[in-house]
Amino acid sequence: MERRIPEGEVPEEVRLVNEFLNTLDLETYGEHAGKPDEEREGLRSPERLRAWFVGRGLLGREVVVNEADRQLAVGVRDALRSAALANSVPARERSDAAGWSFQELPLVVRFGENSKPELVSGEGGVRGALGRILADVVVASSKGTWARMKICAAQDCRWAYYDHSKSRTGRWCAMETCGNRHKTRRYRRKKRSSAWQEG
């Protein structure tokens, strides 16, 4: 779950979002097979949520995190994963993600250096940290990078990743693992099917 992304691979405005989406580990192949469900949830306790935010400089060590904060964070993460999943399929196959709103996480425009406007969270604490993540999504959307945040098509992976393909049609978090496993399975099915038809 702490698979860190090399800095040059994901644009800065979606790096934090990508890490947040991957606090849920749905991989079930290889070393991940048989992993207990509670270990798949990186935000399984208020303490784990606090540690995740503190580790990324989004929260001070003195901030107390409770179960309601954790549930809010999981809800935001799951909604963003659903939106990234919508980015992963052709437009004609998408479910409508419109209508989601996070009214309890206000964002404000602040003018920083050289009167440059910035979108920032209007609160502190956990809500402020979540607001920062949502602000990054808005910035990424304006730069065209949010549409490249996807969920791996491999049902035994479901890792969130940034699609680097020129055509923006990547399906796998890594071709050398998930893509190759898919191609191998497809080849074996095809081979079995042709052997069955011949016999």
Label for each model-derived stretch:
Residues 1-151, 158-159, 196-199:
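Short helix-coil boundary/hinge micro-motifs
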Residues 158-166:
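Histidine-centered nuclease catalytic patch
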Residues 20, 123, 165-166, 191:
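Solvent-exposed, flexible loop/coil residues
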Residues 151-156, 175-177:
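Short, cysteine/histidine-rich loop/knuckle motifs that typically chelate Zn2+
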Residues 31, 162, 183:
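Short acidic, gly/pro-rich beta-turn/loop elements at beta-sheet edges
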Residues 168-179:
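Cysteine-rich micro-motifs
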Residues 144-147, 164, 179:
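Residue-level signal for short amphipathic helical patches enriched in basic/charged
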Residues 177-194:
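Basic DNA-binding region of bZIP-type proteins
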